[in-house]
Amino acid sequence: MSTRSVSSSSYRRMFGGPGTASRPSSSRSYVTTSTRTYSLGSALRPSTSRSLYASSPGGVYATRSSAVRLRSSVPGVRLLQDSVDFSLADAINTEFKNTRTNEKVELQELNDRFANYIDKVRFLEQQNKILLAELEQLKGQGKSRLGDLYEEEMRELRRQVDQLTNDKARVEVERDNLAEDIMRLREKLQEEMLQREEAENTLQSFRQDVDNASLARLDLERKVESLQEEIAFLKKLHEEEIQELQAQIQEQHVQIDVDVSKPDLTAALRDVRQQYESVAAKNLQEAEEWYKSKFADLSEAANRNNDALRQAKQESTEYRRQVQSLTCEVDALKGTNESLERQMREMEENFAVEAANYQDTIGRLQDEIQNMKEEMARHLREYQDLLNVKMALDIEIATYRKLLEGEESRISLPLPNFSSLNLRETNLDSLPLVDTHSKRTLLIKTVETRDGQVINETSQHHDDLE
């Protein structure tokens, strides 16, 4: 394995090749490799060291040192105490030149990568400035425009809620007043109904009295008819008696004319007639007076009962009219109450719908505020990620700067003069071969993070021989 291939593979493994995109991940792996050093005695120059330090967004760090590797297939050379075989020095110089050429190529590649990273850092800084400007603009807009808009809308909603509360209180007061009026009218209706029942009871009693008076009048009328019939019968009987008496008187008059003288009989008959006529007139006058008195009493009672009946009918008519007017008034109040209750239900439903709409509006505004907060938090997280990337790139730039400074200082060192070396005779075949296999210990540390918090951390050790 050549130095260039080792360095390239290590560089691709640490920083990613041209076709590999560096993607941020929630897991970070730290890989540490042990240092490999190859040396051969004190005749060689100090081992050439090359260190690569890089920091990628994924968080991978690696160090690696390599030295000039001597092949075991170099032919054995016998070195004398006072002479040097320059073929070995030529081979070393050739290999050193090749190594320097490879190092120059690698440095050129590193410079290109470094330029790309600088461009990337500048681009990320510009993006960072743009995001900061957008964040400041969003903060200013959120404080100026959205805050004022929300405050104005909240004031309007509060004003509408206060107005609706006042309207509701006014409607409730009107409802209470109407309820009191209805209760008062109901009490008045109950009183009128009681008075109506009393009037009906009085009317019923009056009707019973009228019926009794009518029965009494009919009885009296029947009695009057019977008395009139009796009077007619008595008149007829009296006339018959008078006729009989006149017949008897005439018969007696005839007999008296025969027996006695005429003037004495006439006077007697006149006296008898006068007596009977006086008795009949007296009886007739008494009967007429009794009939007239009874008829007057019955007429007066009938008139009195008729007046009471007429008054009762008038009172009943008045009570019926009052009951009808009160019934109409109660029906009107019931209609008014139903309309007010319907209006109140409609207003309550409207209030409920408007309150639900206001709650939905408030919820929507709160959701928008929450979304804006989440978006601001996301921008802040992106800004923090960009800051982390920038810090990693700053560290990488500093590492490249140290690399360049180290390479410049190493390149400025003088080459050793192999012609002036005083080597003693040594058989290279007797020397132990350089162990071309080295032991490398890999420490793989995996850290899993979520939302900036460490949720899992594992470490693994691997031994690798090359």
Swiss-Prot record:
Name of encoding gene: VIM
Cross-link Glycyl lysine isopeptide (Lys-Gly) (interchain with G-Cter in SUMO1): residue positions: 445
Any single Gene Ontology cellular-component annotation: peroxisome
Induction comment: Up-regulated by muramyl-dipeptide and lipopolysaccharide.
Compositionally biased tracts (Low complexity): 1-13, 20-32
Residue numbers bearing the Phosphoserine modification: 5, 7-10, 25-26, 34, 39, 42, 47, 49, 51, 55-56, 66, 72-73, 83, 87, 144, 214, 226, 299, 325, 409, 412, 419-420, 430, 438, 459
Region (Coil 1B): 154-245
N-acetylserine: residues carrying this PTM: 2
Ranges where the record places region Tail: 408-466
Annotated protein name in UniProt: Vimentin
Species lineage: Eukaryota, Metazoa, Chordata, Craniata, Vertebrata
Ranges spanned by the short sequence motif [IL]-x-C-x-x-[DE] motif, renumbered to the chain: 326-329
Entry similarity comment: Belongs to the intermediate filament family.
